[in-house]
Swiss-Prot record:
GO CC terms, sorted: chloroplast thylakoid membrane; proton-transporting ATP synthase complex
Family: Belongs to the ATPase B chain family.
Residue intervals passing through the bilayer: 35-57
Gene behind the chain: atpF
Name of the molecule in the record: ATP synthase subunit b, chloroplastic
UniProt function note: F(1)F(0) ATP synthase produces ATP from ADP in the presence of a proton or sodium gradient. F-type ATPases consist of two structural domains, F(1) containing the extramembraneous catalytic core and F(0) containing the membrane proton channel, linked together by a central stalk and a peripheral stalk. During catalysis, ATP synthesis in the catalytic domain of F(1) is coupled via a rotary mechanism of the central stalk subunits to proton translocation. Component of the F(0) channel, it forms part of the peripheral stalk, linking F(1) to F(0).
Cross-referenced NCBIfam families: PRK07352.1
């Protein structure tokens, strides 16, 4: 460092003595240049300004520390909120999965119930169809029976008309009278 000061001083001396520096030059006389006055003023400023500067720097430091502390608190709050949000997200995912599984189970239950109800309806319809068929069959049989009976009666009447003459008619009357008399004697 001393070498540097010496070279700077040599340069200043050279510039002062050089013919190029006739209008410009450095005054190396300390008393003429008020260097002492400047040093005193700077010293007073440093001595008394040190408190102000220290206060300003301390205030600035405190502001920076408070800002950092606030930023850290906000970071912690944001981290907590993020963790809570992740927790709620996981809970929502779990709830959605539970709802999906329950929905599938409920859907399967309802499917089975619908199949069972359809089977029951089909059985009921089959039973109803069978009952209707039996009823119609019975009705048809009854109609056939009635027609056969009517035709048999008509045939019997026709046969009676053609075969029934006076002698046969008298024999039948006598036969029935005999039956009635035998019944009367059994009753007495």
């Amino acid at each position: 460092m001393g070498e540097r000061i010496k070279s700077t001083m040599d340069l200043l001396i050279y510039l002062q003595n050089s013919h190029l520096a006739t209008g410009f030059g450095f005054n190396t006389n300390l008393f003429e240049t008020n260097l002492i006055n400047l040093a005193v003023v700077i010293g007073v400023l440093v001595y008394f300004g040190k408190g102000v500067l220290t206060t300003l720097l301390n205030n600035r430091k405190e502001t920076i520390v408070n800002t950092i502390r606030d930023a850290e608190e906000r970071y912690q709050e944001a981290t907590e909120k993020l963790n809570k949000a992740y927790t709620r997200l996981e809970q929502a995912k779990a709830k959605a999965e539970e709802i999906r599984v329950n929905g599938l189970a409920q859907m399967e239950i309802e499917k089975q119930e619908l199949i069972k109800a359809a089977d029951e309806d089909s059985k009921r319809l089959e039973d109803s169809k069978n009952a209707t068929l039996r009823f119609e069959e019975q009705r048809a049989i009854e109609q056939v029976r009635q027609q056969v009976s009517r035709l048999a009666l008509e045939l019997a009447l026709e046969t009676l008309k053609t075969r029934l003459n006076r002698d046969l008619h008298a024999q039948m009357i006598d036969y029935h009278i005999g039956l009635l008399q035998s019944m009367e004697s059994v009753i007495d």
